[in-house]
């Protein structure tokens, strides 16, 4: 992995070889360039972004289960130093890639797949990339090492769906690295200003990465919200569709406290509706019924004006 500020210095980019040149993500950007050979392969890859605490891990885990119930082989990758993305699937905090690499003094050849990939509920395979110590290192490096390990152990060859659950609303080059592997980036947001403001920044990050990679905006997942009027305003202005809606139900909040996905809880009418929504979303994403969109992020002032702030 290379961190570059000058896009003309990318490997393979010369004045006489312009077809290999890659434009920068934006003026003054510091880019994390992953090894171009580290491609995930034939699996459909989705990255889940959104404001910190908005419910990305809950959304990711239940979406993973929904895909698995469609008969798909699913791998969920948590990209957060807290390494708690998959614990409702595995019922525990599993060791991170960084943890296990450190245990063998970063001699990756000494690792076995079972050292860092764990089976969760309904056969969903779970991995926590982890992250560098606070204030040091780069999350993009961790993502790169994780994909490298998976490829070296041929763990992506039998995978249909990969879901990256990504730290907060950070859109730096490091934590935007999963976008370089993704087909679609989904944005989780609530019906409030802070969540939508973060969503707008994420749209900008996805659009920047889309210049050089195959990732596209997949849509907005409304979460923890009974109403969606503010989200729908934002959706109309940016061209990013709302593709699912999960209301603010106490049963969803409690599912995480119970270390369970929503598909494991006792039946109730309101729970059944949420399960059906996850199954509908997974089906549409798998079948490509939600076409990619060319979302256009708003300027900060436009967000304030749009949502009624003076």
UniProtKB/Swiss-Prot annotation:
Instruction: Please indicate which superkingdom the organism of origin belongs to.
Output: Bacteria
- Which InterPro entries does the record cross-reference, listed alphabetically? NifH/chlL_CS, NifH/frxC, P-loop_NTPase, Protochlorophyllide_ATP-bd
Binding-site residues, [4Fe-4S] cluster: 138, 172
Which EC class heads this enzyme's classification? oxidoreductase
Entry's Gene Ontology molecular function annotations: 4 iron, 4 sulfur cluster binding; ATP binding; metal ion binding; oxidoreductase activity, acting on iron-sulfur proteins as donors; oxidoreductase activity, acting on the CH-CH group of donors, iron-sulfur protein as acceptor
Q: Which cofactor does it need?
A: [4Fe-4S] cluster
Q: Which residues bind Mg(2+)?
A: 57
Q: Which reaction(s) does the protein catalyse, per the Swiss-Prot or TrEMBL entry?
A: chlorophyllide a + oxidized 2[4Fe-4S]-[ferredoxin] + 2 ADP + 2 phosphate = protochlorophyllide a + reduced 2[4Fe-4S]-[ferredoxin] + 2 ATP + 2 H2O
Question: Which GO annotations describe the biological process of this protein?
Answer: light-independent bacteriochlorophyll biosynthetic process; photosynthesis, dark reaction
Q: Which CDD domains match?
A: Bchl-like
Any idea which UniProt keywords this protein has? 4Fe-4S, ATP-binding, Bacteriochlorophyll biosynthesis, Chlorophyll biosynthesis, Iron, Iron-sulfur, Magnesium, Metal-binding, Nucleotide-binding, Oxidoreductase, Photosynthesis
Q: Quick one: which residues bind ATP?
A: 53-58, 82, 223-224, 247-249
Signal peptide segment: none
- The EC number on file is 1.3.7.7
- A Pfam family of this chain: Fer4_NifH
Instruction: List the pathway annotation.
Output: Porphyrin-containing compound metabolism; bacteriochlorophyll biosynthesis (light-independent)
The UniProt record lists the keyword Ribosomal protein: no
The free-text cofactor remark is:
Binds 1 [4Fe-4S] cluster per dimer.
Assigned protein family: Belongs to the NifH/BchL/ChlL family.
What role does this protein play?
A: Component of the dark-operative protochlorophyllide reductase (DPOR) that uses Mg-ATP and reduced ferredoxin to reduce ring D of protochlorophyllide (Pchlide) to form chlorophyllide a (Chlide). This reaction is light-independent. The L component serves as a unique electron donor to the NB-component of the complex, and binds Mg-ATP.
Provide the assembly information: Homodimer. Protochlorophyllide reductase is composed of three subunits; BchL, BchN and BchB.
The protein in question is named: Light-independent protochlorophyllide reductase iron-sulfur ATP-binding protein
What's the name of its gene? bchL
């Amino acid at each position: 992995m290379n961190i570059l500020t000058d896009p003309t210095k990318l490997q393979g980019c010369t004045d006489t070889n312009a077809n290999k040149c890659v434009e920068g993500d934006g003026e003054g950007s510091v880019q994390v360039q992953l090894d171009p050979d580290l491609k995930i392969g034939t699996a459909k890859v989705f990255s889940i972004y959104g404001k910190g605490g908005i419910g990305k891990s809950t959304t990711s885990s239940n979406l993973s289960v929904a895909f698995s119930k469609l008969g798909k082989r699913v791998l969920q990758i948590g990209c957060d130093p807290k390494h708690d993305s998959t614990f409702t699937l595995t019922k525990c905090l599993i060791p991170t890639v960084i943890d296990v690499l450190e245990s063998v003094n970063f001699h990756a050849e000494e690792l076995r797949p079972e050292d860092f990939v764990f089976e969760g509920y309904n056969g969903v395979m779970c991995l926590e990339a982890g992250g560098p110590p606070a204030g040091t290192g780069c999350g993009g490096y961790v993502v790169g090492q994780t994909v490298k390990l998976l490829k070296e152990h041929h763990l992506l060859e039998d995978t249909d769906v990969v879901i990256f659950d990504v730290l907060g609303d950070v859109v730096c080059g490091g934590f935007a690295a999963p976008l370089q592997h993704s087909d679609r980036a989904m944005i989780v947001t609530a019906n409030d200003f802070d969540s939508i403001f973060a969503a707008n920044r994420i749209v900008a990050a996805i659009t920047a990465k889309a210049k050089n990679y195959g990732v596209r905006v997949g849509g907005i997942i409304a979460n923890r919200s009974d109403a969606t009027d503010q989200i729908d305003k934002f959706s109309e202005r940016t061209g990013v569709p709302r593709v699912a809606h999960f209301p603010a139900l106490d049963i969803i909040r409690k599912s995480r406290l119970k270390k369970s996905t929503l598909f494991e809880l006792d039946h109730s009418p309101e729970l059944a509706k949420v399960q059906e929504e996850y199954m509908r979303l997974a089906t549409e994403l798998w079948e490509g019924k939600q076409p990619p969109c060319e979302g256009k992020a708003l300027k900060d002032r436009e967000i304030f004006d749009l949502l009624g702030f003076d």
